[in-house]
């Protein structure tokens, strides 16, 4: 069975077929770096990291691009709050600070680096060129103050992504009217300069690009058009992604410049949508100072990506315990592989977990079911495989371990499994010495070594004459 994913553009779960076989080109809208990254951001980027890992496991090359909107009203306002009259000179410090935090938190969440992280400020010339083309084609117009607006009414089927009609949007007063606009729904491609704000030159006036244009220009610059998938949070469907489609349709003549539109649901805290206005925003720094990145990844995985996720620290406690179980299974099986025999005396029934894991991901990326199967396999390893390892061939044991690691790698939840080689050699030597002491019935000294190892995070598990160890990662 092939990969199947929900496409917001068609409102259907569709088979994922890329334009170029085994090459998946994707763009995910990045942060506007004016404040701390929060767990809502984390959910989006962890999902697309898992999706990427899964595609790579299926043999795809994945080219992923994530942008930074490093100039925006929110950044300017933040700079004014912090620097006052010096904001014009020091505004760049704001995005630099929070972009650095984004990368720091991404590392702690074991998110694989994207292939490019374009910034708006590095692509202004390309954006000016796009606007000039749109004006020439008659899809954009220059307002009296030099701002340039996209004329929504010139594009057929505007609202196709969000399934809304222009008349209904106007009647619902979804967009604030501005001087110089022909239509309240028209949006800025170029914003005229306001004294005290950063600006760039253009044929119309000093100013800066509009948000919706920025993502179209950067995505197609790095991926071409059309490309395979475009993603972000569900809150971006309208107006941001809707307006991107309109711009690309006018520029390229394409009905859709991305084949699949993939959106991640929002987070709730105590039943309310997480937002600054409600004061219930939880930052990634706060969470990752108390919990492992793998626990947060697993907590995200326990909710289907398209559904709202109720976030709680109780959920993280549960996820952290599950991560410990996953590591225990990995560590104990890794140690036990060496003791397996050379021939099968008994079959190990582990295939159902693997089949169900991949079947879940093939069906609109159901990570709750996939996580359940991975955890089920971990428990099976601990309760069954280790106690019957002498009856299974070494190759069977290796196969179990290999498949287990592949599954965990897709969800990104065994990322700290490697122990430094020097440390591992010392641990093995002490474990072997303790085993000799036990054989010679020098139990008091053997117990002393067990206690000393426990003090550095190494737990010993005795199965008859065999001893395995697990390493508690810090």
Swiss-Prot record:
GO terms for cellular component: cytoplasm. NCBIfam families: cysS (TIGR00435). Its main location: cytoplasm. Binds 1 zinc ion per subunit. Its cofactor is Zn(2+). The gene is cysS. It comes from the Archaea. Its EC number is 6.1.1.16. A motif ('HIGH' region) lies at residues 31-41. InterPro entries: Cys-tRNA-ligase, Cys-tRNA-synt_Ia_DALR, Cys-tRNA/MSH_ligase, Rossmann-like_a/b/a_fold, tRNA-synt_1_cat_dom, tRNAsynth_Ia_anticodon-bd. GO terms for biological process: cysteinyl-tRNA aminoacylation. This is Cysteine--tRNA ligase. Keywords: Aminoacyl-tRNA synthetase, ATP-binding, Cytoplasm, Ligase, Metal-binding, Nucleotide-binding, Protein biosynthesis, Zinc. A motif ('KMSKS' region) lies at residues 273-277. PANTHER family: CYSTEINE--TRNA LIGASE, CYTOPLASMIC, CYSTEINYL-TRNA SYNTHETASE. It holds the Pfam family tRNA-synt_1e. It comes from Pyrobaculum aerophilum (strain ATCC 51768 / DSM 7523 / JCM 9630 / CIP 104966 / NBRC 100827 / IM2).
């Amino acid at each position: 069975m092939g990969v199947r994913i929900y496409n917001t553009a068609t409102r259907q779960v569709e088979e994922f077929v890329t334009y170029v076989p085994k090459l998946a080109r994707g763009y995910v809208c990045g942060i506007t770096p004016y404040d701390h990254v929060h767990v809502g951001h984390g959910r989006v980027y962890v999902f697309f990291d898992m999706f990427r890992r899964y595609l790579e496991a299926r043999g795809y090359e994945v080219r992923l691009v994530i942008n930074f909107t490093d100039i925006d009203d929110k950044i300017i306002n933040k700079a004014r709050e912090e620097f006052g009259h010096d904001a014009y000179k020091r505004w760049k410090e704001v995005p630099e600070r929070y972009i650095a935090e984004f990368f720091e938190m991404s590392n702690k969440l074991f998110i694989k680096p994207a292939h490019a992280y374009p910034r708006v400020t590095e692509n202004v010339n390309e954006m000016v060129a796009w606007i000039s083309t749109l004006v020439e084609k008659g899809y954009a117009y220059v307002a009296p103050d030099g701002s340039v607006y996209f004329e929504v009414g010139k594009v057929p089927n505007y609202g196709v992504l969000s399934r809304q009609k222009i008349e209904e949007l106007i009647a619902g007063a979804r967009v604030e009217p501005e001087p110089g606009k022909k239509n309240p729904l028209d949006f800025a491609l170029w914003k005229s300069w306001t004294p005290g704000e950063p600006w760039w030159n253009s044929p119309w006036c000093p100013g800066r690009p509009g948000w919706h244009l920025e993502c179209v220009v950067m995505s197609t610059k790095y991926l071409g058009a059309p490309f395979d998938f475009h993603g972000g949070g569900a809150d971006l469907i309208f107006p941001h992604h809707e307006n991107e489609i309109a711009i690309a349709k006018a520029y390229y003549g394409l009905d859709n410049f991305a084949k699949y539109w993939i959106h991640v649901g929002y987070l709730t805290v105590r039943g309310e949508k997480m937002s600054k206005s409600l004061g219930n925003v939880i930052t990634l720094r706060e969470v990752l100072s108390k919990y492992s990145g793998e626990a947060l990844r697993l907590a995200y995985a326990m909710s289907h990506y398209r559904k709202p996720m109720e976030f709680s620290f109780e959920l993280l406690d549960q996820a952290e315990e599950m991560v410990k179980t996953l590591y225990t299974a990995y560590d104990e099986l890794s140690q036990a592989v060496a003791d397996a025999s050379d021939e099968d005396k008994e079959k190990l029934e582990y295939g159902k977990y693997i089949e169900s894991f991949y079947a879940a991901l093939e069906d609109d990326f159901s990570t709750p079911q996939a996580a359940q199967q991975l955890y089920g396999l971990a428990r099976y390893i601990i309760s069954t495989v280790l106690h019957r390892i002498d009856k299974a061939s070494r190759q069977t044991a290796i196969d179990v371990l290999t498949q287990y690691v592949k599954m965990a790698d897709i969800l990104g939840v065994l990322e700290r499994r490697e122990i430094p080689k020097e440390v591992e050699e010392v641990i093995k030597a002490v474990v072997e010495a303790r085993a000799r002491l036990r054989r010679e019935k020098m139990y008091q000294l053997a117990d002393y070594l067990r206690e000393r190892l426990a003090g550095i995070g190494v737990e010993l598990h005795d199965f008859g004459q065999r001893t395995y160890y697990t390493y508690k990662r810090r």
